[in-house]
């Protein structure tokens, strides 16, 4: 086949489908297609996250993360209300367990205020009123944080996109992107081809690979970090009422293991952050030699490893030692034991790394000629999806 379209979106996660939905609204007469390599939507990052509606408290004021999270959160909540998608604004606590963490907590609170987040510093006694089993000498109560199932949101984007005459091709693994005559672009898979005017790369874990097919930036690499979870057994779900987070380490872009209640009442514990041996290597024994070799031979990888080797070893130890994982959870909820938790499916986060070994701590979206590349869209991309989609469309 060789069908022709105005716009081609690569990637069937929440960023890809929110973009497809808004693009089809803005250009109702245009032919738009979304290509997904899997047989269904949300098989990877969107379908494997903890389902939190983030407030924007963590991000540097004025950054793309801060701006898109704040505006995207409002848009997401309105979209859910308009389309009868279940979500809950339940609030969360970020706890400090010692004096050093209280200093970081104060700085985080001030950042939240700068970003316009509804939050307050609370005492230990107030913390225990909100989360009776939490441990902390002080905490931030983030009232506007919430929970949601992002697969439900993405499915609605997909349904509305189809209703607006959008096309979706599943099982289409993009292997070639080439500019051809008349300023058209040929996008190819095995035996299948489509022609379009513009390409939008929302490929998540594979965004760097798609970018390189079109001659995009080579000064960064998507490094896959696996986040492993446990789940509280039903008899232990009372240990967490809503969301309990640690005070984050500002030197690392991940938030640390935490407790997250789902809409169904279940409670996830995690994730950690360990190097994944492949972009879809979810199991402990999964290993993709080519992808792992590509990661560790990237010039910035060893520089990153030298900066964060101690934390990397700690995370790896927790990955293979349940007692160590439980020890991290006990810092937040001392009553928890290994008997309270059961394994839960892991996820893999796409995190861009630059040549200097820096983990890029902001959204990066760029355009050139015939393609818009979403180079880096880690958390809070799901919360921010509609705002990110507007940014993408503005660059077409």
Language model: regions and residue ranges:
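Flavin-dependent oxidoreductases
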Residues: 18, 177-288
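Beta1/beta-strand and adjacent pyrophosphate-binding region of the FAD-binding site
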Residues: 2-15, 33
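C-terminal catalytic lobe of FAD-dependent flavoproteins
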Residues: 299, 304-396
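Glycine-rich FAD pyrophosphate-binding loop
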Residues: 24-47
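Helical element adjacent to the flavin cofactor pocket in flavoenzyme catalytic cores
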Residues: 140-198, 202, 206-209, 384-395
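Helix-loop-beta segment of a Rossmann-like dinucleotide-binding subdomain
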Residues: 4, 86-96, 108, 121-124, ...
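Dinucleotide-binding Rossmann-like beta1-alpha1 core, especially the glycine-rich loop
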Residues: 51-126, 136, 256-257, 278, ...
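Short beta-strand to alpha-helix junction loop
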Residues: 60-71, 95-105, 140-160, 169, ...
